[in-house]
Design a protein with these regions (language model features):
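C-terminal motif of bacterial Sec signal peptides marking the signal peptidase cleavage site
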Residues: 14-16
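Flexible coil segments in periplasmic/lumen-exposed cytochrome c-class electron-transfer proteins
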Residues: 119, 131-136
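Solvent-exposed helix-loop boundary motif
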Residues: 18-35, 39-123
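Short, linear, compositionally biased motifs with a strong N-terminal bias
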Residues: 10-12
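Bacterial N-terminal signal peptides that target proteins for export
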Residues: 1-7
Length: 136
């Protein structure tokens, strides 16, 4: 009997806590994806397609190994006379021109001897450069 009385009192207390609010649920669209970081470029492009493939590691310039790639690319002049990475400007970044097979490149499209980078990966490099090529 005491249990039933306690259950009834608890039910009344819970009902008293309710509100008369009839707010509609609002759909909150997902946030935009986070910006592309240099770490993403290193882990998803340079490591599998450039450095670890043996093309740009150790003595082969520019060395794109983790810990060295950023300093070897950003604001560093290419043999073609333009910076490998010109922060803020993919069209003036030789690396971007090479991966998109743009006009004026010396040699072949990168990565050489392998499949071209996907459009998503190329877009990631473009975004990173457009953001100023931060070392994040």
């Amino acid at each position: 009997m005491k249990v039933q009385g306690l259950a009834f009192a608890l039910s009344i207390a819970l009902l008293a806590c309710g509100t008369d609010s009839t707010t509609d649920m609002v759909f909150d669209p997902p946030d935009e994806p986070p910006p592309v970081t240099f770490s993403f470029v290193q882990d998803n492009i340079f490591n599998p397609s450039c450095a670890l493939s043996g093309c740009h590691a150790d003595a082969t310039l520019p060395n794109l190994s983790a810990g060295l790639a950023y300093g070897n690319l950003v604001n560093k002049e290419s043999r073609a006379g333009i910076d490998l990475i010109e922060p803020g400007d993919p069209a003036k970044s030789y690396l971007f021109i090479k991966i998109t097979n743009g006009e004026g490149i010396q040699g072949s499209r990168m990565p050489r001897g392998g499949p071209a980078l996907s459009e998503d990966l190329i877009a990631a490099v473009r975004e990173w450069i457009e953001r100023g090529a931060p070392n994040d």
